[in-house]
Design a protein with these regions (language model features):
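Structured mid-to-C-terminal alpha-helical surface segments
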Residues: 1-54, 64-74, 80-315
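Glycine-rich beta-strand-to-loop/alpha-helix junction loops that act as flexible
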Residues: 56-60
């Protein structure tokens, strides 16, 4: 798609979604779709078999397939399919070696996607611009870059892969939605993106992961509360979820990041003292929907009460 047609695409998306969101966020969403479309094309050609071992999850999945695109999500989050078994290895050293063996071909296949879709990426694991490793190889963060058609600057897209997640629910394959559905107009301006098929987290797994994120991040991200609010409003009552299961999900995160235990203690203290809730995560610039502030505040109060109940389980 050339620059002139891309401007038409942005206008079409804004008109379709009835939003005045800034062009740069529409472009980032488009580039994520380009990356995923290229992934599917290479997958169909049988050239990236190791990427089939990744299970899609997170805010991008929620936005695209469960919540009818209420906001732009900027990242791609995955869990390795064998993460439950990797957790069973008895030593950190054995886990690290097993993860290293698995990540190498995954990185090479991400590079194939980048080369075909004209994203910048370097497979050198010492180059932190492109690859970051956290928590004894439990989590790999890959950053790929594409030149903006609007500004000419590099646009980063973060891909996070977790190798030590405890998955509690079965995962099935679904087709991932794009922000717009292919039609004659889009075809006329050169839009020809495929929709990728991934194995994905079910909604229940994402809900308990959102609870864990809220209670164990170093700092609250408003998007986690916002996502639970929208799930509760449109899909399922998140306030009725089993606290014991949520706490098991929280405990499972300590192997991924030991700091989460201290963060839980800190956040539970803030909740108890009425000081929890500060966030510098401004999601208004990413939102495509209007939110009833009264309803949102009421849900947040109910959510915080539930979080306090979960905190009592950590004593």
């Amino acid at each position: 798609m050339n620059r002139t047609n891309f401007k038409k695409y942005i206008s079409y998306v804004k008109e379709t979604k009835k939003t005045n969101i800034e062009d740069q966020y529409v472009e980032k969403d488009y580039l994520i779709s380009v990356f995923l479309s290229t992934w599917q094309n290479l997958k169909d050609a049988g050239k990236i078999p190791h990427l089939d071992k990744l299970i899609f999850k997170g805010g991008t999945l929620l936005a695209r397939n469960y919540l009818d695109y209420p906001r732009i999500s900027e990242y791609l989050d995955f869990t390795y399919e064998g993460s439950n078994k990797l957790r069973e290895l008895e030593s950190k050293n054995k886990r690290e070696k097993a993860i290293l063996k698995r990540i190498t071909p995954i990185i090479d296949e991400i590079k194939l996607i980048c080369d075909m879709a004209k994203f910048g990426f370097d497979t050198n694991r010492t180059n932190r611009k492109y690859i970051m490793v956290r928590n004894s190889r439990a989590v790999y963060t890959l950053n790929v870059y594409h030149q903006s058609m609007i500004t000419g600057e590099e646009i980063p897209i973060k891909i996070e892969i977790n190798f030590l997640e405890h998955i509690f629910h079965d995962c099935s394959e679904i087709t991932i939605n794009n922000i717009v559905t292919q039609d004659l107009f889009l075809k006329s301006i050169g839009y020809n993106l495929s929709q990728i098929k991934f194995r994905t987290y079910p909604l229940d797994e994402m809900i308990i992961e959102k609870y864990r994120a809220i209670l164990t991040r170093d700092e609250l991200k408003e998007r986690d509360v916002f996502d639970l609010y929208l799930i509760n409003k449109n899909c399922k009552n998140v306030l009725e979820f089993d606290n014991k299961l949520i706490f098991k999900k929280i405990e499972s995160g300590y192997m991924i990041s030991p700091d989460r235990s201290n963060n839980l203690e800190k956040n539970c203290t803030l909740l108890h003292d009425g000081d929890f809730g500060d966030s510098d995560d401004d999601i208004s610039h990413l939102s495509l929907v209007e939110i009833n502030e009264k309803d949102y505040a009421e849900f947040t109060n109910q959510l915080y009460d539930k979080l306090k109940d979960i905190c009592t389980m950590s004593v």
